[in-house]
């Protein structure tokens, strides 16, 4: 067996795998008790699934806190892409779920803050979808927005999903640059009847602001 040849082959394989790994990390903030902006719940869930699939396909690594009504469909999208294409799921998705009990009597709010900080500091981009709970906007999403802005992430509120995402859009759009407004309009000024077109426009808008 030629050891030098094997080492060279292994190096090429490792280099190839390295080049295939995602180059951008995107934090997706979202939760949903209801799915505003879509004609039915199925389309909204398909939108989340397709968005995650296409982000992975375009070499983005998704970071998510597994918010209700959102996290499950992001997971399914990334998983489908990775298993179809023989990719490692861990290279394309990080799930950082929030603790749901206080059995140790730790300060649960403090743990939530630290969890949000750790998720956001890993990322270059923050996208915001839906954000509603019991007919009110999600305070957790607003906290994530402020953290992401503080840390200088590129912000993408998807306002047609309503809730906190719309609230964040209204805060960010009016006084922003023309290029940011162009990207926001590309994302949000479209019918939600065509899920694939929606996702295509979101990817184009992200690339527009990453130039």
Predicted regions and their residues:
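Acidic/glycine-enriched connector segments
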Residues: 22, 34-38, 42-209
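Conserved hydrophobic helix-helix packing surfaces used for dimerization/oligomerization
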Residues: 25-26
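Short amphipathic alpha-helices and their capping/turn segments at secondary-structure boundaries
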Residues: 2-4, 8-21, 148
């Amino acid at each position: 067996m030629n050891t030098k040849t094997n080492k060279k082959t292994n190096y090429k394989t490792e280099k190839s795998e390295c080049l295939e790994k995602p180059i951008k990390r995107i934090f997706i903030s979202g939760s949903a008790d209801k799915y505003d902006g879509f004609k039915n719940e199925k389309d909204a869930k398909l939108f989340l699934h397709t968005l995650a699939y296409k982000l992975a396909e375009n070499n983005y690594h998704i970071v998510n806190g597994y918010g209700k009504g959102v996290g499950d469909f992001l997971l399914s999208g990334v998983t489908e892409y990775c298993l179809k294409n023989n990719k490692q799921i861990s290279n394309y998705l990080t799930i950082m779920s929030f603790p749901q009990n206080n059995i140790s009597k730790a300060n649960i709010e403090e743990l939530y803050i630290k969890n949000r900080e750790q998720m956001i500091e890993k990322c270059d981009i923050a996208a915001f979808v839906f954000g509603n709970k019991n007919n009110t906007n999600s305070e957790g999403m607003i906290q994530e927005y402020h953290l992401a802005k503080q840390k200088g992430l590129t912000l993408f509120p998807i306002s047609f999903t309503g809730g906190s995402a719309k609230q964040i859009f209204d805060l960010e759009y009016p006084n922003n640059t023309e290029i940011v407004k162009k990207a926001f309009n590309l994302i949000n000024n479209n019918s939600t009847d065509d899920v694939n077109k929606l996702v295509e426009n979101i990817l184009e808008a992200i690339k527009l602001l990453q130039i």
